[in-house]
Amino acid sequence: MRSANARYTMTIFSPGNMSLPIVSYQAGLHLNLLVSGLFIQQKCLGYQQWLQRNWPVDTPETGTQRSTSMITIDTGTDELLCHIDDRVAVITLNKPHKKNALGDILTPALRNTLLLVEQDDRVGCVMITGSGDAFCSGGDVSGMGASPGQPRSTQERIAELTLKQETLTLRLYELDKITVAALPGAAAGAGLSIALACDLRVAAKRAFVTTAFRNIGLSGDYGGSWFLPRLIGLARAKELYYTAQRVSSEQAVQLGLVNRVFDDETFREDAQAYASEIANGPSGALSRMKVNLNQGLDQGLRESLVLEARHLVESGNSNEAQEAITAFMEKRPPIFHTDL
């Protein structure tokens, strides 16, 4: 069910001026009018220019298929971009001049955007990525030494950080959609925690990951110490935390941190295709699979069997299952979605 608070707008961007909203457009028209911008020397680059650089629509000469009917979601800030393409909600951390570091503008926008795309029936998969040559460098270290305007007790600070973590990485981990972290480059600190909270991770060859916390004298946050041992085992997770070593994309695949590695030159297209395959699958069944797998880590076999039985009966009664059976009988691929 789509949130009433979601605002879908198309805008014209004029460098140096404010974006001008367009509230209607002719269906099927190839639009070059999209919202937001890319920080370059602390100025904004038009979203369409960013899109052409990072998510190019292939021409007939390339021989590949890409949708041109993308829908832009207004995140409320140029530091976070979001569009829906082929049922994939692509959320882009957009502070390349700071390696997409988290901050007081970007992070709240990310929390809110996750809620919007989760409630949008046109979204079958959520992919989080970063502008430029990084995924996310974690918290903005340049602002960590700033003194707070109002003194707070230790307990108040703990409660605040706990809430921030729960509304970001816990929300991401429990999201009703399948999530993919697409790493064009470095994922460090809390940025790595965000990637680990996703169901799947794909990386460019040049990408690397690092816990990084020891380098700034911090113990870690946003759930990395919970996610990492479940992916690679406790001993290896401890080593990565204690040493903050850089793990290349190829090493990350061997460890089980990353699912796929794509060439740098075609990374964004390959990541989009990877997410699109998931997004166009049976969303209800995939969501139930996610719950089965996540809960199975922390419950006994008996409880998992009961959960699987309930979800199998529910999915068996769904339109998705009926379409799959019909498609099998008609010897054609199933079509689970016709909304985009």
Task: Indicate residue ranges for each PLM-predicted region.
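Low-acidity, Ser/Thr- and Arg-rich intrinsically disordered low-complexity segments
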Residues: 2-9, 14, 19, 24
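Conserved CoA-thioester-binding segment of acyl-CoA-metabolizing enzymes
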Residues: 30-32, 56-59, 66-131, 170, ...
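Crotonase-fold acyl-CoA enzyme core
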Residues: 104, 170-286, 313-326, 330-332, ...
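Glycine- (often His-adjacent) and acidic-residue-rich active-site loop
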Residues: 130-171, 187, 217, 300
